Amino acid sequence: MNRGKEWDWMDNKKDLLICFGTRPEWLKVKPLLNEIDNYKLLFTGQHKDLLKDIEVDYRIEIGDKTNRLDQIISDCLMQFPDGDFDVLVHGDTVSAFACALAAFSRKLKIIHLEAGLRSYDLKQPYPEEGYRQMISRIADINFPPTSISAQNLFNEKADGLSYVVGNSVLDNLI
């Protein structure tokens, strides 16, 4: 399903910027930290109480109206750190979309964890289904959790590479 492209993480010397802003995102990316040597953490601030237990390299200060999606996206675009790194986003949150969009605008490689999950109804769940589809379209590498989600990406002709990787939370529990 990779449309003839290849990617080798071991040959990559760039830092991986791991973006998260919610507790569910953190729980799903945390197991990866033991497997990756060269990473930096970017916190987007939806669940601010997370920071008391986690040291991050970058923090995006979102406005007081944190329930406004446009404000969160604007703050992420304006405050996204400069650097030559690959950017990992997880799932379908507004912070994942905003960080992917910021990376895309800076021509950075985007890696989408938990890609390809679909309802195919842009209004359910809203706005997450739209974020899922848009992130997968601009991602260079998609990591779907199942073969069904990988097939969704293939059917949509998503240009990025696709590797079925399972669910990091379930893998961590086993």
Where are these regions (language model features)?
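Glycosyltransferase specificity loop/lid
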Residues: L16-Q79
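Glycine-rich phosphate-binding loop signature in dinucleotide/nucleotide-binding domains
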Residues: D11, Q79-F85
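An aromatic- and histidine-rich active-site surface loop
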Residues: L88-R106
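A short, histidine- and acid-enriched strand-loop-helix "catalytic/donor-clamping" loop
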Residues: H112-Y126, D140
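Nucleotide-activated donor-dependent transferases that construct or modify glycoconjugates
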Residues: G4-T22
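Short glycine/serine/threonine-rich phosphate/pyrophosphate-binding segments
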Residues: E25-K30, T93-C99, A150
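A nucleotide-sugar donor-handling region in carbohydrate enzymes
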Residues: N2-K5, T44, K48, G63, ...
